[in-house]
Amino acid sequence: MLRRHQRFLAYGAAGWLFEVLFTGAKGPVRDGDWRLAGHTYLWMLPIYGSSAYLFEPAHNALRERPWWQRGTAYAAGFFAVEAASGAAIRRATGEIPWDYRRARGNRPVPANWRGLCRPLYAPVWFVAGLGLEHLHDRLSPPPTPPSPAATPRKRPETASDLA
């Protein structure tokens, strides 16, 4: 099992990798650009790495819920992190790398909230959260439930207990 700071780096690296793949795959679809040039930002390592501190406890708390409830909760959580981290970066630097208020080429400005979040990405975050469950379980296996032998037995009720 990896320590938390090691998992921080693993989530950060995985996030960078998937962002580069995602942005590279959008080129042909969005612009007809078949160079498949993906990119990310140094800012993203700590943002993705924060999954070790934010996503893991949420996943542990939601393990018994149906997949669609977990995915919805993860998407909402990712939107919250995207908005909070984007607002912090904007406050520190005056802009954010993924500002959704910018037009892309001759396309209109996409629906967004303050340039920080795009509702269109909800399915992406939904699926990403469910995918992160598998990464989390590989990096830090879930605790095993106690065996029945280790669970104290309840004393059977007697007539004197009921009186």
Role assignments for model-derived ranges:
Residues 1-163:
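Aromatic-rich, lipid-facing transmembrane alpha helices and their immediate juxtamembrane interface loops
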